[in-house]
Amino acid sequence: MSVITDIHAREVLDSRGNPTVEAEVYTELGGFGRAIVPSGASTGEHEAVELRDGDKSRFLGQGVLTAVENVNGEIAKAVIGLDVTDQRLIDQTMIDLDGTPNKGRLGANAMLAVSLASARAAADELGLPLYEYLGGPNAHVLPTPMMNVINGGKHADNNVDIQEFMIMPVGAKSLHEAVRMGAETFHTLKSLLQERGESTAVGDEGGFAPNLKNNEEPFEILVEAIQRAGYKPGQDISIAFDCAASEFYNKDTKKYVTVADGREYTAEEWTSLMEDIVDKYPVISIEDPLDENDWEGWKVFTERLGDKVQIVGDDLFVTNTNYLEKGIKMGVANSILIKLNQIGTLTETFEAIEMAKEAGYTAVVSHRSGETEDTTIADLVVATNAGQIKTGSMSRTDRIAKYNQLMRIEEALGSTAQYKGIHSFYNLHKQF
């Protein structure tokens, strides 16, 4: 047993220039771990609390000095002396210390930084790569990536309501090949947009952010880009998209108000529109198609489309086993998006992934729109054999860093590495 001897946190910046928490953990045998916490733009209302200072004289109120002080003070005092390899004890100690159901006192950003840095310190001390330390000898599945190539909604300053349009190289034979296919399609898409006189400026996650005539046009453009890049839509590369529907849902009128279409939709009408898109285009995954509190609407949506496509709950589940358990019992969605900072500790993240798998739901490990150079999620997705990752486009170093780490991991695993492609959708029997 080697104990934690020191913890230090500081305020650094994320990819949007907003402050975030970085923590370092040191052990008595020389282990060292560093982790930086990401942050989201479209956040679920049930997420764990990201503690911000609110001091308008610093970073427009977005500073995190209080969270940093919580790490360097209360958390350090409680965690120093604990066995660095006892992740569950470290995380539970912080949960108990916080004492709130949503980590609102110490901040999920403070707790997650320590949780992740502790795991890295333990891996460093044992001389193991992080994915092997977290997942053991069975960690071998490389994820099928969701590559966000067209941005809309809160991730871009354009008129597209749907937040993310993604390509998934389901026909690739390896992660390396998947990255190449994605990059080729991304660059082909750029040329296509330029030909059409559209903007090729990129959004928060590295995808292009053009103004388009409606919410269906991006699907048409993606199909053409995939074909021009030399691939078959639906066979080599499929399409995934994230509505982030809570962001354009009017709670008073109970309608989905779209800018691109200039229309308002009831849940029934919006579901029918999504069904038409699935029938018309090579779509394999839809995230947050309805408002996060419309559980009955989600149930109907799942009944109508659940055997055709992966239906991912992000704002709906917020990486929380309580909400996931409710969804499983109701038959809502068939997949969960996993975001470390939605729940705040590594232990609780593992619990959510495990619960999803046991229920036959897939788990998609995800970045946030405000990212950093930290690559923990690349190791996490391999450690858990989750099979899918959502980590942005083929641009911006904060996104590419994760792909580069995954390629390193695939190389290190050698012949034991497995890229499942279409078979990572084990919740969709009709795909095989």
UniProtKB/Swiss-Prot annotation:
Belongs to the enolase family. It comes from Lactobacillus johnsonii (strain CNCM I-12250 / La1 / NCC 533). This is Enolase 1. It is found in: Cytoplasm; Secreted; Cell surface. Its cofactor is Mg(2+). PANTHER family: ENOLASE. It is an enzyme of class 4 (lyase). GO terms for molecular function: laminin binding; magnesium ion binding; phosphopyruvate hydratase activity.
